[in-house]
């Protein structure tokens, strides 16, 4: 029975954390959703490490619900895969620090291409946060 008690406790903790996010939603979130909905190209989601795992899930969820989307690994991007990004795409980039080297190396090319960037980062005033047209902490 202790396993069941622990499982319930874990689910209660996770549910409370999700509910706490409700109060953190603001206009930036609405702007990001609007940008994705209006996207004429694809939604490209990118991030390294644990953020990359979350990005893969975001891309898979978008694709499975009818939004053309895919995950682009930042290390692969800087070694030739940046050519897949077009100006009518929307890029969502995630990095807790906002300074992940592989990801920050992609940002200059994104700027040149003109694809709008939604930055998801905990790093206020970071390279990623500064580069995003929509910044969600």
Regions found by a protein language model. Name each.
Residues 41-137:
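Glycine-rich phosphate-binding loops that contact phosphosugars or nucleotide phosphates
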Residues 1-41:
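An N-terminal, well-structured beta->alpha segment
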């Amino acid at each position: 029975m202790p396993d069941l008690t622990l499982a319930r406790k874990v689910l209660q903790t996770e549910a409370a954390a999700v509910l706490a996010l409700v109060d953190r939603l603001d206009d930036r979130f609405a702007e990001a959703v609007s940008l994705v909905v209006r996207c004429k190209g694809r939604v490209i989601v990118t991030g390294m490490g644990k953020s990359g795992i979350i990005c893969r899930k975001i891309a898979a969820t978008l694709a499975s619900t009818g939004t053309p989307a895919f995950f682009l690994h930042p290390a692969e991007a800087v070694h030739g895969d940046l050519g897949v990004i077009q100006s009518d795409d929307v890029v969502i980039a995630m990095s807790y620090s906002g300074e992940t080297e592989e990801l920050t190396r992609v940002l200059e090319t994104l700027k040149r291409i003109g694809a709008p960037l939604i930055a998801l980062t905990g790093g206020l005033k970071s390279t990623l946060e500064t580069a995003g047209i929509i910044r969600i902490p």
